Amino acid sequence: MTKKLHIKTWGCQMNEYDSSKMADLLDSTHGYQLTDNPEEADVLLLNTCSIREKAQEKVFHQLGRWHMLKEARPELIIGVGGCVASQEGAHIRERANYVDIIFGPQTLHRLPEMINHVNGTRSPVVDISFPEIEKFDRLPEPRAEGPTAFVSIMEGCNKYCSFCVVPYTRGEEVSRPCDDILFEIAQLADQGVREVNLLGQNVNAYRGASYDGGICTFAELLRLVAAIDGIDRIRYITSHPIEFTDDIIDVYRDTPELVSFVHLPVQSGSDRILTMMKRAHTALEYKSIIRRLRKARPDIQISSDFIIGFPGETQQDFEQTMQLIADVNFDMSFSFIYSARPGTPAADMVDNVSEEEKKQRLHILQERITQQAMQYSRRMKGKVQRILVEGTSRKNVMELSGRTENNRVVNFEGAPSMIGKFVDVEIVDVYPNSLRGVLLRTEDQMTLRSHESTASVIARTRKENELGVGMYQP
């Protein structure tokens, strides 16, 4: 009888990536098949996020529901992973002693051994250590699930912003070796992936070892990924302003595979608040980066993160944030009301901004960003956009849906054979959350570079070093 696995995921794209790797890993080692129904699962995994307010209580609320399943089936295995597990591992066991496995973001690769231990001894396992980059060496080969894919290039963060728990839950920055990343992306390209999203808490801090003993920078990695046959679009999240260096900006000048859209969190437009947040840059320095980016790629569009109501934020501080939003003309944003994260320096600050004031400021900010986004969308009407067709439309199963470079959803009429390929459409209608297009040309009518498999490229360019070791040298 097939064993079933249910994974519930909260939080960032990195958590989504980790959950997909858990599923692939347990399928390869134990034959577990994913199910959306927790009642039929043999293993329940909760991949948690500690960014939002009351994250811990949300975890215990979910575990309470699963506890009833455990009482009915004592052999059911319940595991809690992610950032809340990393931060609150011991506390989770104290409050929910029926949880069998507690693991952190850096130890998910040990899940097979943990499950074997629980099955063999019926005793719990807690492993929330930070074993560097070991987990990537233990994960199964990547499996494409459509024309886009996410690839983790690094873990952790060294910035220690005063409001953020990431350094405490995911550890400090550790970069994957360059060749490992390129090989994973090449494998995905061979499976039909056309767009790759590079993931990390601070991707532009990437410093990965290369095969020759050197260090590969993020700018160099972007160019190497762009050279992989079959990869026609590159995105990345998330980056930090203080490491958005000129060599990264230069990639936007000469690498068309890198999309004209960048997410660059700023959090506030007030230098006083930025200092309290320990962001290590000013609003003017942030605007300087954007100015250089737009000089390198005039059509680039910018999204950002904003924290509203940080302790001590005055009306003047908020107005400076609104001025920055107008000056940069952000296209999109992820904006949230500040909530203290236990263990962070900001949690000890006096939170003297009323909830009503926070909500009002958030509403004003989001309204402004929405207006600016609609202005960008309206400018696209009548223009030709190249989109990567991802599948059928959510609005109408008889239509197709894809995304533009600037991350807008476009619905249009087309044939199923277009899924996974690029098409050019004319934008004819603009809606708040999507665009409507009319098909103009398909991929075989474009002048895209021809695709050659990775195996073929390696065979054609293979060389041996002085030790007789085969190497791929582009």
Swiss-Prot record:
<comment type="similarity">
    <text>Belongs to the methylthiotransferase family. MiaB subfamily.</text>
</comment>
<dbReference type="InterPro" id="IPR006638">
    <property type="entry name" value="Elp3/MiaA/NifB-like_rSAM"/>
</dbReference>
<dbReference type="GO" id="GO:0051539">
    <property type="term" value="F:4 iron, 4 sulfur cluster binding"/>
</dbReference>
<dbReference type="InterPro" id="IPR038135">
    <property type="entry name" value="Methylthiotransferase_N_sf"/>
</dbReference>
<dbReference type="Pfam" id="PF01938">
    <property type="entry name" value="TRAM"/>
</dbReference>
<feature type="domain" description="MTTase N-terminal">
    <location>
        <begin position="3"/>
        <end position="120"/>
    </location>
</feature>
<dbReference type="InterPro" id="IPR005839">
    <property type="entry name" value="Methylthiotransferase"/>
</dbReference>
<keyword id="KW-0004">4Fe-4S</keyword>
<comment type="function">
    <text>Catalyzes the methylthiolation of N6-(dimethylallyl)adenosine (i(6)A), leading to the formation of 2-methylthio-N6-(dimethylallyl)adenosine (ms(2)i(6)A) at position 37 in tRNAs that read codons beginning with uridine.</text>
</comment>
<dbReference type="Pfam" id="PF04055">
    <property type="entry name" value="Radical_SAM"/>
</dbReference>
<feature type="binding site">
    <location>
        <position position="49"/>
    </location>
    <ligand>
        <name>[4Fe-4S] cluster 1</name>
    </ligand>
</feature>
<keyword id="KW-0411">Iron-sulfur</keyword>
<keyword id="KW-0408">Iron</keyword>
<dbReference type="InterPro" id="IPR013848">
    <property type="entry name" value="Methylthiotransferase_N"/>
</dbReference>
<dbReference type="InterPro" id="IPR023404">
    <property type="entry name" value="rSAM_horseshoe"/>
</dbReference>
<dbReference type="GO" id="GO:0005829">
    <property type="term" value="C:cytosol"/>
</dbReference>
<keyword id="KW-0479">Metal-binding</keyword>
<keyword id="KW-0819">tRNA processing</keyword>
<dbReference type="InterPro" id="IPR020612">
    <property type="entry name" value="Methylthiotransferase_CS"/>
</dbReference>
<dbReference type="InterPro" id="IPR007197">
    <property type="entry name" value="rSAM"/>
</dbReference>
<keyword id="KW-0949">S-adenosyl-L-methionine</keyword>
<feature type="binding site">
    <location>
        <position position="157"/>
    </location>
    <ligand>
        <name>[4Fe-4S] cluster 2</name>
    </ligand>
</feature>
<feature type="binding site">
    <location>
        <position position="12"/>
    </location>
    <ligand>
        <name>[4Fe-4S] cluster 1</name>
    </ligand>
</feature>
<feature type="domain" description="TRAM">
    <location>
        <begin position="378"/>
        <end position="441"/>
    </location>
</feature>
<feature type="binding site">
    <location>
        <position position="161"/>
    </location>
    <ligand>
        <name>[4Fe-4S] cluster 2</name>
    </ligand>
</feature>
<dbReference type="GO" id="GO:0035597">
    <property type="term" value="F:N6-isopentenyladenosine methylthiotransferase activity"/>
</dbReference>
<comment type="subunit">
    <text>Monomer.</text>
</comment>
<keyword id="KW-0963">Cytoplasm</keyword>
<keyword id="KW-0808">Transferase</keyword>
<feature type="binding site">
    <location>
        <position position="164"/>
    </location>
    <ligand>
        <name>[4Fe-4S] cluster 2</name>
    </ligand>
</feature>
<feature type="binding site">
    <location>
        <position position="83"/>
    </location>
    <ligand>
        <name>[4Fe-4S] cluster 1</name>
    </ligand>
</feature>
<protein>
    <recommendedName>
        <fullName>tRNA-2-methylthio-N(6)-dimethylallyladenosine synthase</fullName>
        <ecNumber>2.8.4.3</ecNumber>
    </recommendedName>
</protein>
<dbReference type="InterPro" id="IPR002792">
    <property type="entry name" value="TRAM_dom"/>
</dbReference>
<dbReference type="GO" id="GO:0046872">
    <property type="term" value="F:metal ion binding"/>
</dbReference>
<dbReference type="Pfam" id="PF00919">
    <property type="entry name" value="UPF0004"/>
</dbReference>
<dbReference type="InterPro" id="IPR006463">
    <property type="entry name" value="MiaB_methiolase"/>
</dbReference>
<feature type="domain" description="Radical SAM core">
    <location>
        <begin position="143"/>
        <end position="375"/>
    </location>
</feature>
